[in-house]
């Protein structure tokens, strides 16, 4: 406590300040703490009050209508939290609603107010997501805070472990022998590019001719993705004639030797494709042949890039779909007849497989061939490796353009050009199916009408005798027939009497 005393005079003034501080007693501190706690409500009370406001603010005809059981729960928890245990007598039979409320309240027993508040808020959490977002609901959410529990899923952890182990297996450089072939997987394009670079470095040491070819391919900055193929020797045998344009015979003859030497030294597969002589030389091959791992799975898809490449191959220029491989590529041309077109020689490493979107290429006759624009086809043979590897073909036009290789002979890919005809066939089949369905529906309608008419006729025939005689008539014959049988003798006698009377008059 602080006391200040002041005194002022006419000629002078003096000020006396006396400060007296009383001792802080422990019971005073406990009393003040109780008063402060009484003034500041607890967290449960604030949440309870916010939840009560939400329930009270619900419109009668709103989108959210709680059930009677739910309202009884809220009522019982509210009464228990505000008034404590139920001490009232049960209402009479004339107040059924009051009896239901009393039963719900008394069922809580000796539950404390704090527990009732917590239960009220917990029930509110169950339905708060189905309620419309209002200011009261926002206030309640702000008071409650995040009330979702994070549960660790053991299955997800196991799946993550499996994926990590699978990633380790994929990233490992060890090769596994499967069905007589060496199989190893790469984790992605980066690891494949690294392996390609290592193979390029190893190829540089093979000879000076190979170095020249590798430098030419490196200058083009092409993406090289190498997949694992078959392990074993490869015999290269191509029996085909190369016809090129006479105007570019000089440069092609100079580039022919390095290309052949590099392909023989590195053991590459040579894939022949042709280009029309009328096409612009500037529109050379562009795009990327994506080399993917050829596993034994029947259906798989590497990425969304596959679909983009497919669209590019189906809709692009016929001469712009050959991509230079990083191992060996050279334009091999020889002077001769220039009427057919110029050829591109694409060298692909022997143990690899050239794929586009993970699909195989196969000609209609089952053997690799190359076509010309005039419809001519020139077959060339090759020595196959493994169980099903074959040299793919590249034909001109959007329908015949595909680079691929077979896996184990278990999966055969269709030509990309057949997709258009396949779609047309599917459309025709659907149209015919619709026509057949319409015919079937018409026949069914006719059958239904015939059966209905026959049923009506049968009902009419069955109802005809019953309509001729009433239900109360005991005899089998109709009443008219019976009346005619009774009356006709009298009629006959009357007619005979009339005849005799006329005869007598004539005689008289």
Swiss-Prot record:
GO biological process, one term: pexophagy
Gene3D superfamilies attached to this UniProt entry: 1.20.80.10
Pfam family, one: ACBP
UniProt keywords, alphabetically: Acetylation, Autophagy, Coiled coil, Lipid-binding, Membrane, Peroxisome, Phosphoprotein, Transmembrane, Transmembrane helix, Transport
Superkingdom per UniProt: Eukaryota
Keyword presence, Lipoprotein: no
Keyword Disulfide bond part of the UniProt annotation: no
Region called Disordered, residue ranges: 175-215, 240-300, 318-340, 353-419
Similarity section: Belongs to the ATG37 family.
Protein name (record): Acyl-CoA-binding domain-containing protein 5
Source species of the chain: Mus musculus
């Amino acid at each position: 406590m602080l006391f200040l005393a002041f005194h002022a005079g006419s000629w002078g003034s003096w000020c006396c300040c006396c400060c007296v501080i009383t001792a802080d007693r422990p019971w005073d501190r406990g009393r003040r703490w109780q008063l402060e706690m009484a003034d500041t409500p607890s967290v449960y009370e604030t949440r309870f009050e916010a939840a009560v406001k939400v329930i009270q603010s619900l419109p009668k005809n709103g989108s959210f209508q709680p059930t009677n059981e739910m309202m009884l729960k809220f009522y019982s928890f509210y009464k228990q939290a505000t008034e404590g245990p139920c001490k009232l007598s049960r209402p009479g039979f004339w107040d059924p609603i009051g009896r239901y409320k009393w039963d719900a309240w008394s069922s809580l027993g000796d539950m404390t107010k704090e527990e009732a508040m917590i239960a009220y808020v917990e029930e509110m959490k169950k339905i708060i997501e189905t309620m419309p977002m209002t200011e009261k609901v926002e206030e309640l959410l702000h008071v409650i805070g995040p009330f979702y529990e994070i549960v660790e899923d053991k299955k997800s952890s196991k799946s993550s472990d499996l994926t990590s182990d699978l990633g380790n297996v994929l990233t490992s450089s060890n090769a596994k022998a499967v069905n007589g072939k060496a199989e190893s997987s790469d984790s992605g394009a980066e690891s494949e590019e690294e392996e390609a670079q290592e193979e390029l470095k190893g190829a540089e040491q093979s000879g000076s001719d190979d170095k020249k070819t590798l430098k030419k391919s490196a200058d083009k900055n092409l993406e090289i993705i190498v997949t694992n193929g078959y392990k074993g020797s490869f015999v290269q045998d191509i029996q085909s004639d190369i016809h090129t344009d006479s105007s570019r015979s000089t440069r092609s003859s100079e580039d022919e030797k390095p290309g052949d030497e590099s392909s023989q030294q590195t053991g590459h597969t040579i894939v022949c494709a042709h280009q029309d002589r009328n096409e612009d030389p500037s529109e050379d091959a562009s795009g990327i042949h994506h080399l993917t791992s050829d596993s034994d799975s029947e259906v798989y898809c590497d990425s969304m890039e596959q679909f983009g490449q497919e669209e590019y191959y189906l809709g692009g220029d016929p001469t712009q779909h050959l991509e230079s491989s990083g191992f060996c590529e050279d334009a091999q041309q020889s002077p001769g007849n220039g009427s057919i077109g110029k050829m591109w020689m694409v060298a692909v490493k022997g143990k690899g497989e050239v794929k586009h979107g993970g699909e195989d290429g196969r000609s209609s006759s089952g053997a690799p061939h190359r076509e010309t624009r005039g419809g001519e086809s020139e077959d060339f043979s090759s020595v196959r490796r493994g169980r099903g590897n074959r040299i793919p073909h590249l034909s001109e036009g959007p329908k015949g353009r595909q680079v691929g290789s077979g896996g184990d002979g278990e999966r055969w890919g269709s030509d990309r050009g057949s997709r258009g005809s396949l779609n047309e066939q599917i459309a025709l089949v659907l149209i015919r199916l619709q026509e057949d369905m319409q015919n079937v529906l018409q026949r069914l309608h006719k059958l239904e009408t015939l059966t209905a008419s026959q049923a009506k006729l049968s009902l009419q025939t069955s109802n005809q005798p019953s309509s001729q005689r009433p239900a109360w008539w005991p005899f089998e014959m109709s009443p008219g027939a019976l009346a005619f049988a009774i009356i006709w003798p009298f009629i006959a006698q009357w007619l005979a009497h009339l005849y005799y009377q006329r005869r007598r008059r004539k005689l008289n």
